[in-house]
Design a protein with these regions (language model features):
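Class I SAM-dependent transferase core
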Residues: 1-78, 86-90, 109-112, 117, ...
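Conserved nucleotide-cofactor-binding alpha/beta core module
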Residues: 66, 71-186
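Positively charged
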Residues: 142, 202-203
Length: 203
């Protein structure tokens, strides 16, 4: 898979992504986060199914999402719907000594991802709904919602947990929304043309 991974890294580099993002993709092996039957496709730029019926997003979509999120070294970051843990691992490489929290409502996914990432001391994964965020660890510099929200409204509970300045990335329908908070003013930018699994409210 070395050749396939190198092709993916070249493709991401040609798309103009930052050195930090490229280095994270180089360091983290996607095949460890997907089922055995699809490992051969680990470095194809496609979404892959997980055993529970959800998916792991295609690498180019993840790279674009991370570019919007703008993670920085030392930041505190929350991912809601952390799934396989692949994106958490990528973010961990970028924020270094920062702290990353993942909320995953699916118990099996939460258990598997905890085991995969147990050596990443800056990652904490909790098996719980992400609807209310993680107020006991707030505020966060960045919040990433990794499942499609049911409407355009981002819960106030999440906005209130965002540091000022800070950024939330949230999939809504077939678009990615970038919500930025600066000096108590919240602005929104939309990036259409994507597909995401729906947000699950209950396990």
């Amino acid at each position: 898979m070395i050749v396939q991974k190198e092709k993916l890294l070249i493709s991401l580099k040609n798309q103009g992504y930052s050195d930090e993002i490229i280095k994270a993709f180089a360091k983290i092996d996607r095949e460890f986060f997907v089922p055995d039957q699809v490992k051969i496709y680990s470095y194809d730029d496609i979404a892959l199914p997980l055993d529970d019926g959800s998916t792991i997003s295609q690498p180019s979509t993840i790279a674009f999402t991370l570019s919007l999120l703008e993670p920085k070294q030392g930041q505190s970051i929350l991912e809601i719907g952390s799934g396989s843990g692949y994106v958490l691992a990528l973010i961990s490489e970028i924020v270094k000594n920062g702290k990353i929290y993942g909320l995953e409502i699916n118990q099996n996914l939460a258990i598997k991802s905890k085991k995969l990432l147990e050596k990443n001391l800056n990652i904490e994964i909790l098996n719980r709904s992400g609807l209310e965020g993680l107020p006991e660890q707030a505020p966060f510099d960045r919040i990433l919602i990794s499942a499609s929200c049911p409407d355009r409204g981002i819960p106030y509970s999440l906005l209130s947990q965002l540091r000022d300045p800070g950024i939330i990335i949230a999939p809504v329908g077939t678009s990615l929304l970038k919500i930025r908070k600066i000096n108590k003013i919240v602005s929104e930018e939309e990036f259409p043309g994507f597909s995401f699994v729906p947000f699950v409210l209950k396990s």
